[in-house]
Amino acid sequence: GAGDCSTHELPGFPVLDNPYNRALPVFLWTDAVDHGKGMNEYDGIRTCDQGIFDDPKDITLNSNIKMIFNLASNTLVNQHGDINRTAKLLKDTSKCEFIVCSDLFMTASAKFADLLLPGVSMFEEENITKPWKFTEFLGFNNKVIEPLYECKTEYEWIRELAKRIDLEEEFTEGRDYSQWMRYIYDDLRTREPELPEYDEFREKGIYKFEEGHYPISFEKEVKDPEHHPFPTPSGKIELFSTKLWKTPMKDFMPPIPRYVAPPEGPEDPLTKRFPLQLSGWHSKCRTHTVHDNNLNLRKLDPQ
């Protein structure tokens, strides 16, 4: 992970209210599949309006996860820890009973789908390209060809599904995909007036923001601590976390930062049976698994 130091807002579809009003860390979805019922705030369970600095009380899940929509993501298996455990969980159909996956390739995650739908590539749809955390630009992805072999974007097939259950108007709000693109961009321009008109941006394909002031971490807290306290119980920088000390996780997450031996690490008794440890890495020629099978890039940057 990395901290966000972007100085501009980025576009995105509006998010609907979650009627269940529970959220969990993405890396703990496997626990929620296996033993979700009863998971609580110490497992990272929050209401949808709470953040990492909130102090929730008596927040629990009342059910295990039984169905997963895995769209444009390889997080089910490939981009997750302990994939052997994850695969074992997914093979047990008494746990997660139905998985919907939309993807371009038969990824490690797609192999576990009960319903596998072919997605469209970046060459077959229009989209707005956003930077990851740091770079100050927006790009426009212009469609090169129409989707092949009756493939549909996620928006299209979810719209068709919504229509069959009489929720099309609530889902689309009267806009098709291209109208949503324009609406989202124009809405962003009300807060980022530096951006050009939508049609100009679409034609040029990229816009780089003018260089401006970059955020300084905790600037407000340092300059005006009275009105901008730190998000801690004391409102100050804490070397000892009283919040962690009061939790049942204090041995695994100590209130004073210190080294905690990881499971299956060099101190684990398992090393007597398995003395070798494999650490994987990947080079700059791929992003996660994207381009891992690109032979031309492998020649340029062997791994």
Task: Name these PLM-found stretches.
Residues 144-160:
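Alpha-amylase-like alpha-glycosidases and glucanotransferases acting on alpha-linked glucans and related
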Residues 9-10, 17-148, 183-303:
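A cross-kingdom feature strongest in bacterial/archaeal respiratory oxidoreductases
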Residues 2-3, 68, 158, 285:
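Generic signature of intrinsically disordered, low-complexity, basic-rich segments
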Residues 155-172:
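Non-catalytic, well-ordered alpha-helical segments in soluble enzyme domains
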Residues 2-4, 13, 236:
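Gly/Ser/Thr-rich helix-start
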Residues 1-7, 174-189:
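A glycine-rich phosphate-binding loop feature that marks nucleotide/adenosyl-phosphate handling sites
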Residues 154-157, 177-180, 274:
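Alpha-helical structural motif
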